[in-house]
Design a protein with these regions (language model features):
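Glycine-rich, proline-tolerant flexible connector loops at the mouths of alpha/beta enzymes
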Residues: 30-41, 53-54, 109-129, 189-191, ...
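A gly/proline- and charged-residue-enriched helix-loop-helix capping module
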Residues: 29-79
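Hydrophobic faces of well-ordered beta-strands that scaffold small-molecule active sites
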Residues: 2-6, 24-28, 55, 80-84, ...
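Active-site glycine- and acidic-residue-rich loops that bind
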Residues: 6, 86-98, 125, 131, ...
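Metal-dependent enolase-superfamily TIM-barrel catalytic cores that perform enediolate-based chemistry
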Residues: 96-144, 157
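Non-catalytic positions within long, well-ordered alpha-helices that form the structural scaffold/packing
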Residues: 18-19, 104-105, 173
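Glycine/Thr-rich beta-alpha phosphate-binding loop at enzyme active sites
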Residues: 118-131, 165, 171-213
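Active-site-proximal loop/turn and secondary-structure-junction residues that shape catalytic pockets
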Residues: 10, 32, 86-88, 117-119, ...
Length: 213
């Protein structure tokens, strides 16, 4: 099936319309425990000559409670995933993932742990083998406490080498993670971009990262 990735329907507004268009699954979010505006505008840049986009949205969303209410009021007619992440100003990022798991475990068909957005400072530190293992063990323990069987998926960055990929896959397998999403946007060098906006800070997507992703 072809699905709609997180980032399009951030606030669970149109997932059923997307199902009616023929998408096999839809992933809403990224959702944080508390509502947040994200980064100041402008924060999306279209690079026409490069067939690319740069975004620095910064997890703008209405917060877990509001999005839970929306999903409960509009029963999904297809496979609905929820992509979760921490609030920008949180002092406990793992705790934020756990709070989101508690909120969505009984209404999502799967939950994606987003550790790969380049627009939340140091979020990609969770690509470290020890830190990722700690996060996933806590998530799995909370699943047991909740008596939940919701599948857990992890979304990774394209800016990792083969050695890192192997380590991450080992951690995912050891923690019974159901799937891996490849990939988020890239914060790699922009030297070859033609558009004058190519210098903008944020995650690069589109043709320039096709091979990398």
């Amino acid at each position: 099936p072809i699905g709609m990735a997180a980032g399009f329907d951030k606030n669970a507004d149109v997932y059923n319309s997307l199902f009616k268009l023929g998408f096999g699954f839809v992933e809403v979010g990224t959702v944080t425990p508390l509502k947040q505006y994200g980064n100041p505008k402008p924060r999306v840049f279209r690079l026409v000559e490069d067939e690319a986009l740069i975004n620095r949205l910064g997890f703008n969303n209405l917060g877990a409670k509001n999005i839970v209410d929306r999903i409960k009021q509009n029963n999904p007619i297809g496979l609905l995933g929820v992509n979760i992440g921490p609030n920008k100003d949180t002092t406990n990022r793992i705790g934020d993932y756990v709070e989101n798991l508690k909120a969505f475990h009984n209404i999502a068909d799967y939950i994606t742990i987003n550790i790969s957005s380049p627009n939340t400072e140091d979020l990609r530190n969770f690509h470290d083998q020890k830190k990722l293992n700690e996060l996933l063990k806590i998530i799995n323990n909370e699943k047991k406490n909740l008596k939940s069987i919701v599948p857990i998926v992890v979304k990774v960055s394209p800016d990792i080498d083969d050695r890192e990929i192997n380590k991450i896959c080992e951690v995912l397998l050891n923690n019974d993670i159901e799937a891996i999403i490849i990939s988020n946007t890239s914060d790699s060098t922009r030297d070859r971009l033609k558009n004058i906006q190519g210098h903008q800070r944020g995650g690069l997507s589109g043709k320039p990262i096709q091979d990398k992703s």
